[in-house]
């Protein structure tokens, strides 16, 4: 008889957004992917890497990608680690800093995968709710848990914490403060400077959203060298393949394309929010590539099903505190115009 660890046997596991077998048949606005293609320079770099060199292992340290990220963000390379998606960094941070039975915490609502990763490690989970002015409810003067995850901008709601408040939290977290900046490029805000000021701050980033590389699995973290060294010890030794490393370098070097793509999404986001308002939806002002919108009748499931029937995928959460609304990714202008037409039809 197979005997699993008790925490693994008892956990539910993370449930990602629906991935259709034929994504081209849908307007896909449910997993916050970027509807625009990657930079042409990224495609060129990947194609150039395909060849005889694939028979050799990749650079285990991903040095070229680390150096490109370090140069972009203004840090020495030893302050940066590359990852097979930012989820790998999040996982390894818990492995590095939390023993079985230790407490990790995060904001509710935010990325539910934090809880899954904690359960795998056997850590205890605590959540902190939000006040109306987007601060943490009942957060202690000093939080003594091992890790506190702060998603900024918040997902699924889209608001941002002020940098002043985040710095205040850095001084109130006795363990490690992980600032998950998955959507920061769309907000044009960052807490990277806090890494220089506080030795317990880690900032994570992904290439899945603003760089249009969700299918490549690329992420990174910026932290003090002693933290990066610890993460280096426990990561998979060849965690980024040759194609991913080439893509990362090319993407980081083409900031002009990133700004162009992000700019389009920001413009469409504002247009879409305005249109939702005209339809009577309540929309939380968003700084991500998505919005959280509540229909007038507060029946998010009804709207979700109506859109699904029209081959438009959005995210509806069964959580009773979120079920009234929908998280809708911002696609191209044409995709969002079709979505508005569908919402008018659904009523």
UniProtKB/Swiss-Prot annotation:
GO biological process: L-histidine biosynthetic process
EC code(s) of this entry: 2.6.1.9
Catalytic activity: L-histidinol phosphate + 2-oxoglutarate = 3-(imidazol-4-yl)-2-oxopropyl phosphate + L-glutamate
Top EC class of this enzyme: transferase
A Pfam family recorded for this sequence: Aminotran_1_2
Top-level division of the source organism's lineage: Bacteria
SUPFAM superfamilies xrefs: PLP-dependent transferases
InterPro entries from the UniProt entry: Aminotrans_II_pyridoxalP_BS, Aminotransferase_I/II_large, HisP_aminotrans, PyrdxlP-dep_Trfase, PyrdxlP-dep_Trfase_major, PyrdxlP-dep_Trfase_small
Similarity comment: Belongs to the class-II pyridoxal-phosphate-dependent aminotransferase family. Histidinol-phosphate aminotransferase subfamily.
Annotated protein name in UniProt: Histidinol-phosphate aminotransferase
Protein species of origin: Geotalea daltonii (strain DSM 22248 / JCM 15807 / FRC-32) (Geobacter daltonii)
Taxonomic classification: Bacteria, Pseudomonadati, Thermodesulfobacteriota, Desulfuromonadia, Geobacterales
Gene behind this protein: hisC
